[in-house]
From Swiss-Prot:
UniProt record similarity statement: Belongs to the IHD1 family.
Name of the featured protein: Probable cell wall protein PGA61
Keyword Cytoplasm in annotation: no
Prodomain residues: 203-223
Membrane topology, from the record: Lipid-anchor; GPI-anchor
Residues bearing glycans: N25, N188
Length: 223
């Protein structure tokens, strides 16, 4: 059908131009020349439909042999010969482009989220490390707090201690006073009994009594 319409429209123009150059205007001549250059066969509708509007279809509209009253526009003539263009291909491609763009954007956002969380974790861990005191500082503080009180208490204890009390302890036990022994008098028979009684009263032991008696016996023998 397209080929028949093309022959019915284009071929008469070609014959008219060849038969009588003055029967058609210059636009018809331009259309015929472009047709012969681009589509030598003359009946190839696909070849003519690929031609641009400015090179072929608009001059064809101005051709008085084809469109004497200019009732048809270039697009209408092109639709009659080439058919209506399919508009479904363009929206489909744009939809695919939009969906692919959205998918790339989603992937980029998904990739950026772990990076931001990792940086925040790194910052929080750095902050925690900076705020934690070092082991040396803790050891220094604990050593100072332990040694200082012990040193001060030791010095105070030494300063308040009476060295004489530690070195020379006093014996608090009362020492019994020993009454002096009465020296026996010579030529007195009661001297031995008196010495014995005096010795027992003064808390003297048996050895003291025996010693006094022996001494008295020696004195008596000497007399």
């Amino acid at each position: 059908m397209k080929s028949g319409l093309l022959l019915a429209v284009i071929l008469p123009v070609a014959f008219a131009v060849k038969k009588d150059q003055q029967s058609c205007n210059s636009s018809c001549v331009k259309v015929l020349q472009k047709q012969q250059e681009s589509c030598p066969s003359g009946s190839d509708a696909d070849c003519l439909c690929k031609l641009s509007d400015s090179d072929y279809w608009e001059p064809l509209t101005d051709c008085d042999c084809i469109n004497p009253d200019k009732k048809l526009s270039a697009s209408e003539i092109k639709v009659q010969i080439c058919g209506a263009p399919s508009s479904s291909s363009t929206p489909t491609s744009s939809t695919e482009t939009t969906s692919s763009t959205e998918a790339e954007t989603t992937e980029a956002e998904t990739t950026e989220q772990p990076s931001s969380s990792t940086s925040s974790n790194t910052e929080s861990s750095k902050t925690t490390i900076l705020e934690t005191p070092s082991i040396q500082e803790l050891n220094a503080e604990s050593t100072t707090s332990v040694i200082t009180p012990l040193t001060e208490s030791a010095v105070a204890a030494v300063a308040n201690t009476d060295t004489s009390t530690l070195i020379e302890p006093q014996n608090t036990e009362a020492t019994p006073e020993v009454a002096p022994l009465i020296q026996p008098q010579l030529n007195n028979g009661s001297d031995l009994a008196q010495v014995s009684v005096q010795a027992f009263e003064n808390g003297a032991g048996r050895a003291a009594v025996i010693g006094s008696g022996s001494l008295l016996a020696l004195l008596l023998n000497f007399i």
